[in-house]
Amino acid sequence: MLQRPAAFSACGVVTLTTDFGLKDPFVGVMKGRLVAHFPAVRIIDLTHEIPAHWPAEAGFWLARSFRHFPLGTVHVAVVDPGVGSAREIAAVEAEGHLFLAPDNGLLGPVLDTATSVIARRVAAPVLVRLGIDAPSATFHGRDIFAPLAARIAASQLAPADLGAPTDELVPGWIEQPRVTAGQVAGTVVTIDHFGNLITDIDARHLHGLPHPVVRVASRELPVRRTYSDVRPGDYLALVNSFGVLEIARAERSAAEGLGLARGAPVVVVTK
């Protein structure tokens, strides 16, 4: 983990990433607590459709999304199967942003890809001083993360107030692609709304492959620039707007057509 000063100055924006969904009132209640503590807060939903109990996907999207927000944004991510246990809370400064999440590996992708990081565990005395010493056992998003994020976003609390720097946060869940001569082996990390299979293979992994093809589900797929480079119904691979390789099917669902799910192997070779 690289530790360098990451200049953070709160801008009043808070993003939310959870596995709560929108059927129940959990997201609304979190927003209510944020506004109650900081009426001028600007709240942006990144996503509330992370698969239940799967912190790895939350970290994957955070690491590829946070740079699109203004410097000084507080990013709150709550995918917390260990809620109410002895697991701690992680606070990470990276490139002028601040991330709050359970210390369960969720922030691993941020730690792995950011160019400047200061990681902390939120000290118990800080929570006591803020009156966050008796949270419910099952809803720390409301009782801990929301009031903590609001105070930071309002510049009432600085990252340095949260605890001493550490390099011992729980590591991330997503392994790096395996790169060898003429080949990159990765996996499907998630499936988007359109049925595209999103992999952990970054565009940079393809630089050493002059004529890449993708092997997946006993097929070899061409790497193209846009979905319209093939006919409707045809399969292809491309580097998407987040800079990662995805498997797609023009105007169809690649996941349904190929019968693949999260964790499926994907190999890129040169022809």
Q: Where are each of the predicted segments found?
A:
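Structural motif
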Residues: 12-15, 41-44, 73-76, 89-91, ...
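Surface-exposed interaction regions enriched in Ser/Thr/Asp/Glu
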Residues: 258-271
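N-terminal glycine-/serine-/threonine-rich phosphate-binding loop
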Residues: 1-86
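Conserved active-site and cofactor/substrate-binding residues in soluble primary-metabolism enzymes
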Residues: 25, 29, 38, 53, ...
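Anionic-ligand-binding alpha/beta catalytic cores of soluble enzymes and soluble regulatory domains
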Residues: 132-200, 205-208
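A conserved acidic, glycine/proline-rich C-terminal tail/linker
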Residues: 198-259
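Active-site histidine-anchored catalytic micro-motif
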Residues: 37-42, 54-57, 70-72, 76-78, ...
